[in-house]
Amino acid sequence: MALVLLEELDYMQQYKEDMSLAKYLFHQGRNFETYDYLGSHFCIEDDQEGFVFRVWAPNAVSVSVVGDFNGWNHQLHPMKKETEEGIWELFVEGLEEFSLYKYAVVAKDGRVLFKADPYAFHSETKEKTASYTYSFKDKFNWTDSDWQKYKENLNAYESPMNIYEVHLGSWKKADDGQFLNYRVIADELIPYAKKLGYTHLELLPLAEHPFDGSWGYQICGFYSITSRFGKPEDFMYLVNLAHEHGIGIIMAWVPAHFPKDAHGLYEFDGQPLYEYQDITKQEHKQWGTRIFDFGRNEIRSFLISNAMFWMEKYHIDGIRVDAVASMLYLDYNRNDGEWRPNIYGGNGNLEAIEFLKILNSTVLTKFPSNLMIAEESTSFPGVTMPPDCDGLGFNFKWNMGWMNDVLSYIEENPINRQYCHGNLTFPIVYACDENFILPISHDEVVHGKRSLVNKMPGEYENKFAGVRNFILYMLCHPGKKLMYMGSEFGQFIEWDYSKELDWFLLKFDAHKKLQTFFSEANHFYLAHSPLWELDCSAEGFEWICHSDHTRNILAFRRLNRAGDELIVLVNFSPVIREDYYIGVPSEGTYKEIFNTDLKKFGGSGIRNRKLPKAKTGQMHGYDQYISVTLPPLSTLIFQPVKQNGMKI
């Protein structure tokens, strides 16, 4: 009995020391597991089970816990102020899991603010705004150890990466139009993505948000997986199943700002707390949202802990950080007089820059095989450089310049494309300045921008040929890849977050064949290392011909580390080009190994069936050339053939 009592005393002493350290590190901006301290947690005190609640509200006069267990009466369960820095605490005996609760925060002006828990693990959704008590203990049995071991040995920079971006609420819906459960989505989405040859899924929305129309980007519950699609353990099932199929999960994450919903982080204790107090930094007026105070220690603990939380609890493989440019610049979408320069007289938000460096260093130290991806739309230097080299420390960045240039090009009538040929060639100039991902994301198929197939000029057949042409060109271009859902089968209308994709289109031959093309092209990409092994190195790409603008043709080589090569020819004209001469680096014969114009893809079936043999003669800087036929609106890939007929 004495031994048991001693063990209990030792445990309590260790518990108090851990809590004391957690408090200290939180206020220092260095507690990156704050979710284990703040929020609601199942525990046992004096042999009584219940939940302990902790919340940070330094400007509050008082705080209490209200919920369905006390009739939402803010006078029944007052919290105790544990620290001068404003952490409040209360143990509620006998409280069961999945109890609804909020914090009733009494502000200095006498208002009673009913706030959802910033650290809640599970929340109500949409019009309902309370938090649930929830414990992760014994909720799910992970079986993804093989994936984790595989990922440990993976060099992401020299591996294929082809991301399928998915909005969970509109990929598919139930027959009655309601949202599907995470498990139901997983059982359909994961095999589908695997069949189509994607390596990763990027999912939105994940964190809890009240408004469907925000697409999940205006978050009130940063630690709550949205309950639109089920419980936390249901989402764990989705991630686990993806890993069992060899597919990584990336989440869209929004540390830049938050909405002004009354139950959320907005002026949490009656005054600006999570947001800047300085009105020149406080708000994104065009979005109607508040900006996190990146220089405040407690906010750094909150946000960095949040990134760690998703990876620790849900085995997320990567984070795509949204709206990075809005964080980096003090004058982002601001007029003169609406912002103040930093201490050096510049427009950089030094606190946000420092925050991003700490974020990436922390995450990639704990999870070195994971991805930290920046959606950054400017030319800010060193986004994917390490912090010790004065970079931000992301390992990849969306190539928004490439995206804008090439989409502008393909939307042009082919007759006029010769005048914007530089849109295709200029991105190669900076292709290795950062570690890039080429994104055709949700932002490019809404708000009048049209779907991918409907961006293409011409008649019906030309639109589909244009998509095939563009996609294989994209797969062969340096950089990892991202494609938004629906593009793979030719969704004609723009994406609508309130409706599922037009899956009925697969009943039509052209759409089914386009889906077949996507699958075969993606699998071809996976199987050929010259298309990805040296994405981040200038050694992986070499122009053959970039100047044939009058005929809308490009030719280039892709190489791997062993020197194996593919020759890519892109014809962005609706005109067939017969006897087209192209310089090649070596003698021998060349074999056409992929052609977007095949009949099984919906094309005309024009092929180079005979193996073109290199002839002696100067062409494009080489001593030999081959003659090939280029179908209209097509991309072709050739490979050198050894003398014995074996491919290199």
Regions found by a protein language model. Give the residues of each.
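Conserved, mostly hydrophobic/aromatic
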Residues: 55, 103, 166, 193, ...
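C-terminal beta-strand-rich structural cap/linker in extracellular carbohydrate-active enzymes
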Residues: 97-101, 610-648
